[in-house]
């Protein structure tokens, strides 16, 4: 009897990816396509279904996991709303995909899918208490406690990117001032670099980028490695914000491991070294040494593996 394979769908506002995944987390096949949100939800759903059938052709793959941005009803498979999909309101996504593919479909918020991917296939394997944070255009995350995903009453808990770390800081898209997302996301870093050009125009960051408009997190951390004063100043602000947030998560959830993923996590020790040191400054002594702070090993495949892990979570591994 052939081994069961999993289908993971990483749904984004710009592109979506569908992957065929082995039970031990190897991606056997992957297709990425433009989402084309402007064509409307019917077209998006149709093309996702077609891609699922393409990827699973000839394979024993009866289950699909899908990680979606926005507010979702995980039990009923409904996307309530998503800023990435303006015309999606109470869309019964799992039912629609099941009708078109003949497969059992499970839905989860993409940030929750990220922590599940770490639990089953990433740095969280073997751990029952996990906090996972993904640093990209925005900041999302999820929490596993006693081996189970923490979702809250309405399934929208663990909004880790929206803890306030700078009460008088930049305005966040959510309408609150000083959220972690407004200080430590890739979007926030690009904004800081644009705003800093007038005063710090001689910074190595801008030489590496070619112009202030092109300057991003990669240029920032590359310049910081070479000791650029402005780059280190922004790096320290990002680290302080992350450390305050992570310290809060440690106090509240008492995790064994804090996993940080997303594009910014690729910065390596120029980010993680000072972050680990700063977290210690903000936590109670009794918590020191009870946790690890690590980079996600999943990198580009985190979305598909997270989506595939939804299946393992729902059908019992």
Swiss-Prot record:
PROSITE patterns: ROK (PS01125). GO terms for biological process: glucose metabolic process; glycolytic process. It catalyses: D-glucose + ATP = D-glucose 6-phosphate + ADP + H(+). SUPFAM superfamilies: Actin-like ATPase domain. Optimum temperature is 93 degrees Celsius. The keyword Cell division does not apply. Keywords: ATP-binding, Carbohydrate metabolism, Glucose metabolism, Kinase, Magnesium, Nucleotide-binding, Transferase. GO terms for molecular function: ATP binding; glucokinase activity. Its EC number is 2.7.1.2. It is an enzyme of class 2 (transferase). Optimum pH is 7.3. Mg(2+) is the most effective ion. It can be efficiently replaced with Mn(2+) or Co(2+) and to some extent with Ni(2+). GO terms for cellular component: cytoplasm. Homodimer. Catalyzes the phosphorylation of D-glucose to D-glucose 6-phosphate using ATP as the phosphate donor. Can also phosphorylate 2-deoxyglucose, with lower efficiency. ITP can also serve as a phosphoryl donor. Belongs to the ROK (NagC/XylR) family. This is Glucokinase. It comes from Thermotoga maritima (strain ATCC 43589 / DSM 3109 / JCM 10099 / NBRC 100826 / MSB8).
